[in-house]
C-alpha cells in the first residue's frame, strides 16, 4: 500500500475544495500557491464517487478527471504492474482503470464498463489497466468526460508538488491554504505514508505476539 503514495501518486499535497467554491476564489488560491515558496507544480482534478458495473459485478470506485493532461505524469504514474511498462494518459476515447478493479469486474483493455454517477449511466471503453493498491479508480480525459456527460466537471481538488516535505514547511502551507473559505480540507502524502508505516508496525507486533503465544 505504501507503494501507492511513493511510486504511483507522486504529488505531495491535495487541497479538497468546497462544492460551493466560486471560480474567483479558486483562481486566487491557485495564484497564491503558484507564488508560494517551494511549490513546483499544481494540477486541478475532479474527484467523484461512482459505481462501475458489468454483467458480473458492481464496484464502488472513484472517478478522477485532470483538467490538464500535459503535466499529469508529474503527479501520477500509469504503468503495468508486471512488465513495468509506463503508459501515457489515454486519449483514444477510452479510460484508465485500476488493476484490481478490472479484475473484479472481469474486464480487459478493449472491453466496456458502465459508469454510474448519480442518475447518469454511460458506457466507457477501457484503454489501459494500471497498477494500483488502494481503493478503485477510473480515469477519464477531460474532453471524454465532457462528451459523456455534456459539460466540464466542477474541478474540486488541487494537487501540489514540492520538494520540502518537512513538518515545518507542510504545517505553514496547510495553515495558509486553510485560510481560504473555499477549501474544505488538505491532506499530505507524508501523513498517509506515516499512517501506513504505523499500521504495518502494529501488524508486526501482533504477529510477534501471536508467534510467542503459539
Regions found by a protein language model. Give the residues of each.
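Structural motif
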Residues: 18-20, 97-101, 162
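Membrane-interface junction motifs in transport/secretion proteins
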Residues: 1-27, 156-160
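Small-residue transmembrane helix packing/gating motifs
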Residues: 8-9, 89, 129-174, 190
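Active-site lining segments that contact anionic ligands and/or coordinate catalytic metals
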Residues: 10-12, 39, 47, 58-60, ...
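Short beta-strand boundary microenvironments
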Residues: 27-109, 123-125, 129
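Peri-transmembrane interface segments
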Residues: 2-4, 60, 169-214
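Long hydrophobic segments that form regular secondary structure
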Residues: 1-4, 111, 119
Amino acid at each position: 500500500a505504501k507503494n501507492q503514495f511513493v511510486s504511483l501518486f507522486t504529488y505531495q499535497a491535495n487541497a479538497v475544495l468546497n462544492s460551493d467554491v466560486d471560480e474567483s476564489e479558486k483562481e486566487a488560491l491557485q495564484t497564491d500557491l503558484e507564488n508560494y515558496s517551494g511549490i513546483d507544480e499544481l494540477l486541478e482534478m475532479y474527484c467523484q464517487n461512482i459505481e462501475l458495473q458489468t454483467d458480473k459485478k458492481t464496484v464502488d470506485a472513484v472517478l478522477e478527471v485532470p483538467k490538464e493532461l500535459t503535466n499529469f505524469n508529474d503527479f501520477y504514474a500509469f504503468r503495468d504492474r508486471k512488465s513495468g511498462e509506463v503508459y501515457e494518459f489515454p486519449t483514444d476515447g477510452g479510460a484508465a482503470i485500476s488493476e484490481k478493479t478490472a479484475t473484479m469486474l472481469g474486464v480487459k483493455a478493449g472491453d466496456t464498463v458502465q459508469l454510474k454517477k448519480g442518475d447518469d449511466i454511460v458506457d466507457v471503453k477501457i484503454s489501459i489497466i494500471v497498477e494500483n493498491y488502494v481503493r478503485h479508480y477510473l480515469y477519464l480525459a477531460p474532453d471524454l468526460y465532457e462528451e459523456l456527460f455534456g459539460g466540464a466537471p466542477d474541478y474540486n481538488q488541487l494537487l501540489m508538488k514540492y520538494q520540502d516535505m518537512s513538518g515545518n514547511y507542510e504545517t505553514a502551507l496547510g495553515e495558509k491554504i486553510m485560510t481560504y473559505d473555499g477549501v474544505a480540507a488538505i491532506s499530505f502524502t507524508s501523513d498517509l505514508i506515516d499512517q501506513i508505516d504505523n499500521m504495518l508496525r502494529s501488524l508486526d507486533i501482533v504477529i510477534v505476539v501471536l508467534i510467542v503465544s503459539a
